[in-house]
Amino acid sequence: MPGVAKRKYVGETMRINKNLSQVLRRLSDVLPYNYNAETLLELFQQLYPHEWRELNQRFDQYKEKDEFLLKKGKKIRYKPNPPKEHFFKLPIVKNILSKGRIAKHNANFDELAYQERFAKFKAKRENAIRSRNEKIAKANELIQNVEPLFIDTFIAAYHKRGISFDEKMEIFKELQKYKSKKTAEFFYKLSESERNNQIRNMAFKHLQVTGNYVKLRKNFNGKKKEYMTESSEFFMTPLDLLKRIESNNVQNKKVYDVFISHSYKDSSVIKKIIKAFNKLSISIYCDWTSDSDFLKRELVSEYTKVVLKKRIEQSKNIVFVKTDNSLESHWVRFELDYSRELGKTLFCINLSDEAEGECNVLQFDVKNETISWTTGLVK
């Protein structure tokens, strides 16, 4: 049906404008004396940063869609307005910035009452912003901000004809652990056009909780094929992972820049170390994040050791995080012994009182979450 996509876009724009109008009505109660267009926009950006960011993200999305259509020799469809233009075209903004409205505001302006009203409003908004920021940070806590080395292989495998539903779920959950341009594009495509209800809704939720603008699509109408209604809890064990690694599964295609050998008791500092490596575009293998769907602590077995051996083999470098906890861990000893057996170069981040020993020392700045080294990592 011609025009359906454009009508959906227009309807979505109307709903967004309605929400923005409600926000701006509240904001109009705390405008300063003799405000202007610049004042209004700056105040909106300051007190409603997430709404402003979503306007920017939405513009970028639909601009890319138009560019894609143009590239394919088709007419552009959406013609989205840049965020500033969108903002100032809102009827309520035009009303707030009208000469009559500003004159009336100035005539009734009370500086003391304004200061008190603005302070309360700002405090309320800061609490709301802080709360949302904390939720987004929590959702992103274990996600690596780096493009995985195997992403193209995984995305190609997802779209391969004949792939099972569980295999699609596996790839989804793997790419969910990374934040990059390609993973974002992958999840946006799933949220818009994936025909399985569970996966499409999972893609929507993942994008939403991690702080991205996304629209929930309705379930497809009409007669549904079996695949569209399939679902899975994807409960897996170390043995399931081992079987996948030993077969020609996507798990066998993984490559990591660094395997972190550490104690799980040091999880708080390990999260910071991972972020520091990610700043340098270095991908990390950390068992309780990278294989969280398979290596559950309550299911530890001999299969876990075999899996860890394979992950060490798939990693280009080994980084030992030396702490009092890791020095007492038999798992860490096992990982280091196997790494030496393979002839892997061993790096060390020493957070203990002991000497570094025979390894290449990496300097880790806990406060700034940065890592530097004098010897090169294999890339």
Swiss-Prot record:
This protein's GO CC annotations: cytoplasm
GO molecular function: hydrolase activity
Residues annotated as the enzyme's active site: 335
Domain TIR span(s) in chain numbering: 254-379
Mechanisms controlling activity: Activated upon phage infection.
GN (gene name): thsB2
Taxonomic lineage from the root: Bacteria, Bacillati, Bacillota, Bacilli, Bacillales
EC number: 3.2.2.-
Subunit comment: Homodimer.
Keywords recorded for this protein, A-Z: Antiviral defense, Cytoplasm, Hydrolase, NAD
Name of the featured protein: Putative cyclic ADP-D-ribose synthase TIR2
Predominant location category: cytoplasm
Function: One of 2 TIR-like protein components of the Thoeris antiviral defense system, composed of ThsA, TIR1 (thsB1) and TIR2 (thsB2). Phage infection activates this protein; by 70 minutes post-infection with phage SPO1, TIR2 generates a signal molecule that in turn activates the NAD(+) hydrolase activity of ThsA (tested with B.cereus). The signal is similar to cyclic ADP-D-ribose, but how it differs is unknown. Expression of Thoeris in B.subtilis (strain BEST7003) confers resistance to phages phi29, phi3T, SPBeta, SBSphi11, SBSphi13, SBSphiJ, SPO1 and SPR but not SBSphiC.
Protein source organism: Cytobacillus dafuensis (Bacillus dafuensis)
Gene Ontology biological process terms from the UniProt entry: defense response to virus; signal transduction
Subcellular location: Cytoplasm
Hydrolase keyword on record: yes
Gene3D superfamilies: Toll/interleukin-1 receptor homology (TIR) domain (3.40.50.10140)
